[in-house]
Amino acid sequence: AEKTELFVFSDAAKKEADAAKVQEIREYVGTVQGFANVSLIVRKENYGLARNVIEGVTEIVNRYGRVIVLEDDLVTNRYFLRFMNDGLDRYEKEKQVTGVTGFSFLDDRTDYDSESYLCGLTGTSWSWATWADRWSYFDAEALGWEKLKTDTAYRRRFNYDNTYNFYQLLKMQKQDEKTNSWAIRWYWTNFKRDGYI
């Protein structure tokens, strides 16, 4: 981590009652050590999760050509950064690979050796990485999602062989003003481009 720059995008509190907690976290970030540099980007107004992530990822990936993203409540393995950077290096020229994640929907498997990688249709919003050229396709409007309404085979594939109802999440994103997920739109972007994570 000592060669890695850390950027923390701290959203403003949604409710005034939470402002002290947000400030406490911001002060804590100021004590974080072990990185080449720690930058705290303080939002003056509440962006909400989707806007904060989208704008933060866009800023960093456009500046550095790649980005590793973590949610704020994770504890990583000591090899996490190496794994993610190795994945970014290994698959950079494989344009069908749209991102890297250390998460898998598979059960814990002991029959994979330490050099194995699995390419799936989706990763997770918890921790992931991508490149600027892949992120440039991010479709905030989720254009073409209507095909999922009528094409059951397409919807089944989008739903990971109906193991999880991603379609419902995307439908809520498009039809419900309360739902505002960057992650389902990123998955849709990658899915319709036949991308793997």
What are the residue ranges of the model-derived segments?
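An acidic/histidine-cluster motif and surrounding catalytic segment
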Residues: A1-V69, L74-I197
